[in-house]
């Protein structure tokens, strides 16, 4: 030991090497014995040691410990001989003295002496004792753990310190790789010498025992120890039970330990415990977790990281803090504060985390590989499967991922995403100790590695063969599961960061060719022969197979295409070949014809009725555009396949123009790709044929078109022309309007009936979806309904006005054109339409239908019983199947809600007086009520104006026909708005008007007792087909009238 420097504070207990030991003085031992005799019940030396399985863990008996302690342990009063900074103090034992742990120097071998000589002594505060502390922190076993746990009072620990056994550590630098590490581990910082490098990079592996030995010492023993012991005490009992197996394997190799009574040793051991604790406590802390991942960092990055560390992370500053602790231990006031703070740490774990977070994080970054390996083997003894998974993971990653556990911020989130699923199934029940991502490293014994880096330290400690075999035996299942877990994360993060350690891990597990030559695409649809399948995952391209998961109807199929039967492929992107506006890209695969039977077998023989040429072609509609990187990788895969199969043409993709002749002759019935995809996008010639039967009309063609945009194919058969029109590959289908002369298709009713209505080919255009029906179609179908659909009895009782009637009634005219300016407004309106009823008396009818168009919206007004002046109840006719009778019996007890309009909510006094009497007889009677029904599919019209105009018209018409005056008011001619089926768009109002009339004729309303419910008058699907039904009716009548005229 260096004792020549004056003023330098001597260590509290010097380590004597090579058998030189200073025996404690007899006076001091006498004082210790006196203290122990004062409270003998507090000291039970044999009690904690009797619980240990010494025969299983220790080769040295308890007597050997005593003998070794007497021969080689220094006196405990050594520190009292020289105080802080050279000031002498009395040798009296202070009750505030901390527990000092002594470590035996393990550098007794030739290599250890050489190692001591190579360490420069450029720091006055670092001595040989510090080197020994840093070089030989022990791998603690359960025996030493339980011994240290029971050291509670200070005088007990002083007396028991003589009985603590020495543990000799095997030097892990005895291998060739260790000597190489010594040469390459120097750091150029001024305040970090080789001693600090050894201290930071070669801390010996701390197991659960070393953790618990630190946490169970009293908090007032050491400031650093109190911080780490507050949180780790929760895992003592659980770790004790499961660390037996691992410790036995280490002890078989002759690894042992010994505790010293030096404060700085405890601080170093406490720091190691902090390493372990942070990994277990901060499970959700991404910064701490990221530092526990195995990564490869360059020397420059490691230097930059160390230069950014605060002063508290410097070993020199740690030594200074240890000095301050030694100064404070002689000051009772300071000691009291430290003890209180230590107790607070035990009481408030959150406060402990806040205080120690920074220093613990930095210490984790300096854990060496061999310490990480020991941690991976012993940090999770509570669960065998968790430990096995971590050991196999480290053996799988091997040496390429061993290094200082530091990550740049860019990689942290990605690695957390990858690592957590691997450990999630093992993390239950290990909330206090096992973190989500413990440090995982690899040793040289667990597997040979071919790639080695000079920047990475790979120590090879002497381990039991059983550990290696255990790692190898348990590595196989985890290795097989690793690519499945990490494949997706690697693929998504490969473009985000320049370095991904998990990608290198997979490269160690999967052959390089198989890993590189695999590509996944997200697709939306697959077209194989006659079927179209929806995507159920990603299509996978490899050199051996192509996997296509898809679903047809309710059947899920995973098609595996053997690449040995692949003939050609194609990749058609929208920007290169503008054949498609629907998808970004199409992948085309052409398989050999002798492979169709295998495809049909995989499709369970339920898809194809027979084999066809179209089955050879597989089209994959990709979800998004393909990147240049993916395109190059796909070409590499195809090149490899072509080399294997001996088909050189396979390495060259087919363009759209080259592939088109292969399937252009297929019909839409044979190929689903042509039917579903190309019919709306590319539409090749002769592939997507849509036949249109038209009348043979010779018309001059326009020959001065600059550039044709479509292809026209003509065929004449049986006096009709069959036309096939397809757009060019770079064009879309566009709606073609008729541009020829207007042609009258039908006259309904046909001659010789008078009042026939003509329908032309222009009128058919309004029957397209989304178009408003014009007045010609409205009038035609209303005439058709009353002449063809209504019963004779109902025809006699009904009258339908033309769609122009209400328009003429409400038309505004110039006052100069009026013959008699003294006429009222109602009389003027009636005069405009007086000739509409010259051959009919509407007051002899029960139902008068008036189509109304306001602001391009169609609705229906039905004038019911205009000849009645009040409500009349009659018996139901026996011959009429009553829709309203059944409805009335169901709704007779309901109250009047929205059916009676607000303007006519009050009925006459006679009605009110009769209602209570007639409620009982309503099921046996039918009600005839004079009213105006408004059947509106939107309720968007000005109903009040319409109803008032119709009342005024009826009043004038009554005077003209009956030659008497009658008032049509809100009381005797009420307006009702029953609930009817409503439209779900903005263009079907005319269709609903026609359906209201048709439903009325089919199932008329004969009972007008309120309320009137017509919500289920007809189903909605009737409206969906009504336009097409009217079109077919017109064309059918057109053919009938054509045949009649020709004959």
Curated annotation (Swiss-Prot):
It is found in: Cytoplasm. Residues 271-286, 461-472, 887-900 have a biased composition (Basic and acidic residues). GO terms for molecular function: SUMO-specific endopeptidase activity. The active site is at residues 857, 936, 989. One of its GO terms (cellular component) is cytoplasm. Its EC number is 3.4.22.-. Residues 1-30, 193-331, 440-474, 883-918 are annotated as: Disordered. It holds the Pfam family Peptidase_C48. Residues 757-1047 are annotated as: Protease. Residues 1-10 have a biased composition (Basic residues). Residues 198-213 have a biased composition (Low complexity). Keywords: Cytoplasm, Hydrolase, Immunity, Innate immunity, Phosphoprotein, Protease, Thiol protease, Ubl conjugation pathway. GO terms for biological process: antiviral innate immune response; protein desumoylation; proteolysis. The keyword NADP does not apply. It comes from the Eukaryota. Residues 234-244, 258-270, 901-918 have a biased composition (Polar residues). The modification Phosphoserine is found at residues 11-12, 25, 432, 442-443. Gene3D superfamilies: Adenoviral Proteinase, Chain A. Belongs to the peptidase C48 family. Protease that acts as a positive regulator of the cGAS-STING pathway by catalyzing desumoylation of CGAS. Desumoylation of CGAS promotes DNA-binding activity of CGAS, subsequent oligomerization and activation. Deconjugates SUMO2 and SUMO3 from targeted proteins, but not SUMO1. Catalyzes the deconjugation of poly-SUMO2 and poly-SUMO3 chains. Has very low efficiency in processing full-length SUMO proteins to their mature forms. This is Sentrin-specific protease 7. It comes from Bos taurus. The lineage of its organism: Eukaryota, Metazoa, Chordata, Craniata, Vertebrata.
């Amino acid at each position: 030991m260096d004792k020549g420097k004056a003023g330098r504070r001597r260590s509290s207990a010097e380590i004597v090497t090579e058998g030189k030991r200073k025996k404690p003085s007899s006076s001091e031992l006498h004082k210790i014995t006196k203290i122990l005799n004062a409270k003998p019940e507090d000291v039970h030396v044999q009690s904690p040691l009797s619980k240990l399985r010494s025969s299983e863990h220790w080769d040295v008996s308890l007597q050997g410990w005593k003998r070794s302690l007497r021969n080689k342990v220094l006196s405990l009063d050594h520190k009292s001989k020289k105080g802080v900074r050279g000031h002498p103090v009395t040798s009296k034992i202070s009750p505030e003295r901390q527990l000092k742990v002594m470590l035996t120097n393990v550098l007794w071998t030739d290599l250890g002496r050489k190692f001591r000589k190579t360490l420069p002594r450029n720091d006055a505060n670092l001595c040989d004792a510090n080197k020994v502390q840093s070089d030989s922190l022990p791998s603690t076993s359960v025996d030493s753990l339980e011994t240290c746990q029971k050291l509670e009072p200070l005088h007990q620990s002083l007396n028991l310190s003589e009985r603590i056994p020495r543990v000799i550590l095997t030097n892990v630098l005895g291998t060739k790789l260790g000597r190489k590490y010594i040469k390459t581990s120097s750091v150029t910082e001024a305040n970090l010498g080789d001693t600090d490098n050894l201290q930071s990079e070669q801390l010996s592996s701390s197991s659960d025992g070393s953790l618990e030995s630190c946490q169970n010492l009293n908090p007032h023993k050491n400031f650093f120890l109190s911080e780490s012991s507050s949180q780790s005490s929760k895992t003592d009992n659980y770790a004790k039970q499961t660390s037996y197996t691992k410790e036995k394997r280490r002890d078989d190799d002759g690894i042992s330990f010994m505790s010293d009574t030096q404060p700085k040793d405890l601080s170093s051991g406490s720091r190691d415990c902090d390493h372990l604790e942070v990994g277990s406590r901060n499970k959700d802390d991404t910064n701490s977790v990221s530092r526990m991942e195995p990564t490869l960092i360059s020397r420059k990055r490691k230097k930059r990281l160390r230069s950014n560390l605060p002063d508290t992370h410097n070993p020199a500053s740690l030594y200074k803090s240890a000095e301050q602790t030694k100064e404070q231990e002689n000051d009772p006031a300071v000691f009291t504060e430290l003890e209180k703070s230590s107790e607070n740490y035990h009481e408030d774990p959150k406060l402990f985390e806040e205080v120690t977070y920074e220093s613990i994080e930095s210490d984790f970054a300096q854990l060496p590989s061999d310490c990480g390996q020991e941690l991976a083997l012993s940090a999770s003894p509570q669960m065998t499967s968790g430990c096995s998974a971590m050991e196999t993971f480290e053996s799988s990653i091997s040496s390429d991922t061993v290094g200082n556990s530091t990550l740049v911020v860019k990689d942290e989130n990605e690695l957390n995403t990858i690592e957590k699923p691997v450990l999630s199934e093992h993390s239950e029940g290990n909330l206090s100790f096992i973190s989500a991502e413990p440090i995982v490293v690899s040793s040289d014994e667990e597997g040979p590695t071919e790639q080695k880096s000079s920047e990475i330290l790979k120590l090879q400690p002497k381990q039991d063969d059983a550990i290696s075999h255990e790692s190898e035996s348990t590595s196989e299942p985890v290795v097989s599961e690793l690519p499945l877990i990490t494949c997706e994360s690697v693929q998504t993060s490969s473009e985000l960061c320049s370095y991904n350690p998990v990608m290198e891990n997979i490269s160690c597990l999967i052959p390089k060719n198989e890993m590189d030559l695999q590509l996944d695409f997200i697709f939306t649809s697959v077209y194989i022969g006659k079927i179209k399948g929806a995507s159920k995952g990603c299509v996978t391209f490899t050199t051996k197979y192509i996997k296509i998961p898809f679903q047809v109807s309710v059947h899920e199929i995973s098609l595996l295409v053997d690449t040995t039967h692949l003939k050609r492929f194609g990749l058609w992107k929208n920007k290169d070949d503008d054949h498609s506006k629907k998808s970004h890209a199409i992948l085309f695969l052409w398989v050999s014809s002798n492979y169709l039977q295998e495809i049909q077998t995989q499709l369970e023989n339920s898809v194809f009725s027979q084999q066809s040429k179209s089955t050879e072609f597989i089209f994959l509609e990709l979800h998004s555009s393909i990147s240049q990187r993916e395109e190059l990788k796909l070409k590499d895969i195809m090149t490899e396949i072509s080399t294997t199969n001996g088909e050189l043409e396979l390495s060259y993709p087919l363009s759209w123009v080259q592939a088109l002749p292969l399937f252009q002759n297929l019909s839409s019935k044979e190929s689903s790709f042509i039917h579903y995809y190309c019919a709306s996008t590319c539409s090749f010639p002769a592939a997507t044929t849509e036949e249109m039967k038209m009348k043979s009309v010779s018309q001059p063609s326009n020959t001065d078109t600059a550039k044709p945009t479509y292809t026209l194919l003509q065929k004449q058969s049986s006096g009709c022309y069959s036309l096939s029109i397809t757009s060019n590959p770079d064009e879309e289908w566009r709606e073609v309007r008729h541009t020829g002369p207007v042609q009258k298709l039908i006259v309904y009713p046909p001659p010789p009936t008078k009042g026939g209505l003509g329908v032309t080919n222009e009128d058919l255009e309004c029957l397209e979806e989304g178009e408003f029906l014009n007045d010609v179609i409205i009038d035609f179908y209303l005439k058709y309904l009353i002449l063809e659909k209504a019963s004779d009895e109902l025809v006699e009782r009904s009258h339908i006005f033309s769609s122009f009637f209400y328009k003429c009634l409400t038309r505004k005219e110039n006052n100069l054109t009026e013959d008699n300016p003294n006429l009222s407004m109602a009389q003027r309106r009636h005069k405009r339409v007086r000739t509409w009823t010259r051959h009919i008396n509407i007051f002899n009818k029960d139902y008068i239908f008036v189509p109304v168009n306001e602001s391009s919206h169609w609705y229906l007004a039905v004038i019911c019983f205009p000849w009645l002046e009040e409500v009349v109840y009659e018996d139901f006719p026996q011959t009429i199947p009553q829709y309203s009778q059944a409805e009335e019996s169901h709704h007779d007890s309901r109250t009047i809600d929205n059916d009676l309009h607000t303007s006519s909510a009050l009925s006459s006094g006679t009605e009110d007086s009769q209602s209570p009497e007639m409620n009982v007889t309503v099921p046996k009677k039918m009600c005839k009520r004079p009213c105006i029904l408004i059947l509106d599919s939107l309720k968007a019209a000005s109903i009040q104006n319409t109803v008032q105009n119709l009342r005024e018209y009826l009043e004038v018409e009554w005077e003209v026909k009956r030659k008497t005056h009658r008032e049509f008011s809100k009381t005797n001619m009420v307006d009702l708005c029953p609930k009817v089926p409503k439209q779900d768009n903005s263009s079907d109002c005319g269709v609903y008007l026609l359906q209201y009339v048709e439903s009325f004729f089919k199932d008329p309303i004969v009972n007008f007792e309120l309320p009137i419910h017509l919500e289920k008058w007809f189903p909605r699907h009737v409206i969906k087909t009504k336009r097409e039904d009217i079109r077919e009716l017109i064309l059918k009548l057109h053919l009938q009238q054509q045949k009649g005229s020709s004959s």
